[in-house]
Regions:
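Cell-envelope/extracellular polymer assembly enzymes that use nucleotide-activated donors
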Residues: 1-2, 30
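Short, well-formed alpha-helical segments that are part of the catalytic scaffolds
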Residues: 10-23
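A conserved acidic beta->alpha catalytic loop
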Residues: 20, 27, 35-45, 63-65, ...
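Acidic donor-binding/catalytic loop of UDP-sugar-dependent glycosyltransferases
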Residues: 41, 90-105
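Glycine-rich, basic loop-to-helix element that forms the pyrophosphate-binding segment
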Residues: 62-80, 102
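Short aromatic/hydrophobic "clamp" motif used to bind/position activated sugar donors
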Residues: 85
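Catalytic donor/gating beta->alpha subdomain of glycosyltransferases that bind UDP-sugars
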Residues: 107, 113-138, 164-167, 171-236
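Membrane-embedded multi-pass helical conduit in multi-pass membrane proteins
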Residues: 243-320
């Protein structure tokens, strides 16, 4: 197994999290860190760790050839020794030492791609509550669609592919103008979506460092939304209808609340919240979501809808400069 981490100016995160990846209980694996023209001490951190871990490999890209992560990812894949690739990020750490084992146990000849889950670390702030809820919402959507053999995206913080999938991907072979979303476009370019499976074992989850200020979070989400406009039309339609239906629910409720149908509106609203709370509770239990999200999810959903509207508009016109 080849674990690949693309890093750009990630010295602090690598010093915190990389050893969680290196200390996995797996018979034979390598960890490849591709230093994408960093200007901090990323390479020095890796070289120091190499003294203790023979499985750790460093590839340094001296000059920035592209604003996207694609060149770094390509370089890592082509340099890998094994037939399967497990992706994660510098700011991530597996929750257990069995991460590689559990993810790889889902692989088969007919299922060469495994989508994992990567929740964010919890901290008591409203931004973090938004991040926690949005991550849960996104995971329910992309994991459930993958189970239906209709996958449309993956999370590069925790995803496994056969090396052949990378080499055969049009996104891997050809340059595009996108600066992010290489993981998503790999799924979009797969002809047989039945070859994708998921891992819901909690010990296969990978914790990720969340943004702690609104500006950084907004910039990160804009990159994600920019990629979504390049999904297949059917996937864009599905996501569009999902968000529009949620927005219509809240707008309709507010309009009817100040009409002569306010009693009916309140009844339907309460029943809907109850049913959704049950399902969100089930999803949260499976995906180990933070408990505060369960208590205030209606507030978070309403706020997130407004934020997603702005992100959707911004993602349509935003010109990205770099993957970081």
């Amino acid at each position: 197994m080849s674990v690949i981490i693309c890093a750009k100016n990630e010295a602090e995160n690598l010093s915190k999290h990389l050893e969680f990846v290196l200390n996995q209980n797996y018979p034979e694996f390598e960890v490849i860190v591709v230093d994408d023209a960093s200007t901090d001490s990323t390479s020095e951190i890796i070289q120091k760790l190499q003294e203790s871990y023979t499985t750790l490999k460093l590839i340094q890209l001296k000059q920035k050839e592209s604003p996207s992560k694609r060149t770094a990812l390509k370089t890592g894949v082509l340099a890998s020794r094994f037939d399967h690739i497990l992706l994660t990020d510098a700011d991530c750490r597996p929750v257990s030492k069995d991460w590689i084992s559990i993810m790889s146990s889902q692989l088969s000849n007919s299922r060469p791609c495994v989508l994992g889950y990567s929740p964010y670390l919890y901290c008591p702030s409203f931004l973090n509550f938004i991040i926690q809820f949005e991550t849960l919402q996104t995971a329910v959507l992309y994991l459930s669609k993958a189970i239906e053999n209709k996958a449309y995206m993956s999370v590069g913080r925790n995803a496994m592919y056969s090396k052949r999938l990378f080499l055969d991907s049009e996104n891997f072979k050809n340059e595009t103008h996108l600066t992010s979303g290489d993981d998503d476009m790999l799924i979009q370019n797969m002809k047989d979506l039945s070859g994708i499976t998921v891992s819901l074992n909690a010990d296969s989850f990978v914790l990720s460092q969340p943004k702690t200020d609104w500006k950084s979070w907004w910039r990160q989400k804009l990159r994600h939304y920019t990629t979504a406009y390049h999904y297949r039309s059917s996937h864009q339609l599905f996501l569009g209808l999902y968000h529009v239906s949620h927005a219509l629910f809240w707008v309709s409720f507010l309009i009817l609340l100040f009409s002569r149908f306010s009693g009916i509106a309140l009844g339907v609203f309460a029943a809907t919240l109850l049913i959704k709370s049950i399902f969100i509770g089930i999803y949260a239990k499976i995906l180990k979501a933070s408990k505060p999200v369960l208590f205030i999810w209606p507030i978070l959903e309403a706020c997130l809808l407004f934020l997603q509207l702005g992100l959707g508009i911004g993602g349509k016109f935003k010109k990205q400069q770099s993957w970081q």
